[in-house]
């Protein structure tokens, strides 16, 4: 099995220390994956769920600290093929539900707060 850590460990100053402690104290060998790998893992896990008749597919993986977006060719489909070969383009935004909540006031989301969140994410696209 592959055990991965994503944006929280990528962006934390002590991410590598955390990974070391998990290994020492729990015995799990976590790998901090880069943004590309995270996007490709999202595609690997979700591509089979897409409508088989779709011309194109967009997969959003909204996490706690980042959001991955992948655009797939819907026509280049083979049941046994690696779905990551269908990726036309991908991006990773350094914002997720936890980071947005932390920056914009937690669970108390007003219309103005929501509009600020939308603007922040839109500026990253």
Regions found by a protein language model. Give the residues of each.
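Nucleotide/phosphate-binding catalytic cleft detector across ATP-hydrolyzing
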Residues: 1-59, 70-125
């Amino acid at each position: 099995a592959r055990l991965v850590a994503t944006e929280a460990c990528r962006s934390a100053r002590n991410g590598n220390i955390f990974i070391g402690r998990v290994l020492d104290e729990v015995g799990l060998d976590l790998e901090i994956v880069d943004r590309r790998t995270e996007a490709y893992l999202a595609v690997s896990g979700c591509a089979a769920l897409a409508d088989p008749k779709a011309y194109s597919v967009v997969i959003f993986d909204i996490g706690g600290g980042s959001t991955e977006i992948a655009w797939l060719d819907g026509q280049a489909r083979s049941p046994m093929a690696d779905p990551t070969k269908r990726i036309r383009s991908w991006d990773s935004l350094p914002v997720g539900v936890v980071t947005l909540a932390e920056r914009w006031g937690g669970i108390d989301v007003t219309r103005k707060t929501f509009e600020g969140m939308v603007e922040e994410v839109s500026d990253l696209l």
